[in-house]
Each structure stands twice: as structure tokens, then as C-alpha cells.
């Protein structure tokens, strides 16, 4: 059976004053590390997003399609559209 934790109130699960005092010296260091790591992650994400939004895919050739195949695809699309309503 688990022992009750002396650093948390067993009814409210709030930290005890001793636990708060023990964590206090690390708070700003942890927030700084979080800010740095979060900033790096966000900057990589935004750089990638902006880089990908600049590409217009003009250099990718579109394969030719027959008119009959195009008509069949349009019919299939319209049927699925009607079924989803």
C-alpha cells in the first residue's frame, strides 16, 4: 500500500509550504529553460511553415487525364457529396 506523501495535502493535493520552499530556487531557471526551448521549437515551426507556403508547386508536372476519366471522377465526387448531406 502506498504511503501518504508528506509534501502534499492528502485531501486537496496542494503542495505543502515545505514543498513550495524547496521548489522556489528552481522556478525561474525552469521558466527560462521553458522559454528557450519553446522559442526554438516555435521558430523552427514558423520557419518551416513560411518556407512551405512559398512553394507554388509549378515544377511538379500534372499528368494528363482523359475526358472520360475526368467525367467519371466528377460523377463519383457528386455522388459522395450527395450521400454526405
UniProtKB/Swiss-Prot annotation:
What residue ranges are annotated as transmembrane?
26-48
Residues in the Mitochondrial intermembrane compartment per record: 49-85
Chief location bin: mitochondrion
One cellular component GO annotation, for this chain's record?
mitochondrial inner membrane
Q: Which UniProt keywords apply?
A: Membrane, Mitochondrion, Mitochondrion inner membrane, Transmembrane, Transmembrane helix
- Return the InterPro entries for the record: Coa3, Coa3_cc
Q: Which residues lie on this side of the membrane: Mitochondrial matrix?
A: 1-25
Q: How does it sit in the membrane?
A: Single-pass membrane protein
Cellular localization per UniProt:
Mitochondrion inner membrane
Any one Pfam family here would be: Coa3_cc
Q: What does this protein do?
A: Required for assembly of cytochrome c oxidase (complex IV).
Q: Which family does it belong to?
A: Belongs to the COA3 family.
How does the record describe its quaternary structure? Component of 250-400 kDa complexes called cytochrome oxidase assembly intermediates or COA complexes.
Q: What is this protein called?
A: Cytochrome c oxidase assembly factor 3, mitochondrial
Identify the species of origin: Komagataella phaffii (strain GS115 / ATCC 20864) (Yeast)
Organism lineage reads as: Eukaryota, Fungi, Dikarya, Ascomycota, Saccharomycotina
Q: Which gene encodes it?
A: COA3
Amino acid at each position: 500500500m502506498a504511503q501518504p506523501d508528506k509534501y502534499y495535502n492528502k485531501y486537496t493535493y496542494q503542495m505543502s509550504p515545505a514543498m513550495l520552499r524547496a521548489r522556489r530556487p528552481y522556478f525561474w531557471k525552469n521558466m527560462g529553460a521553458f522559454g528557450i526551448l519553446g522559442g526554438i521549437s516555435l521558430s523552427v515551426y514558423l520557419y518551416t511553415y513560411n518556407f512551405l507556403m512559398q512553394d507554388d508547386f509549378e515544377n511538379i508536372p500534372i499528368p494528363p487525364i482523359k475526358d472520360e476519366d475526368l467525367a467519371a471522377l466528377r460523377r463519383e465526387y457528386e455522388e459522395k457529396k450527395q450521400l454526405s448531406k
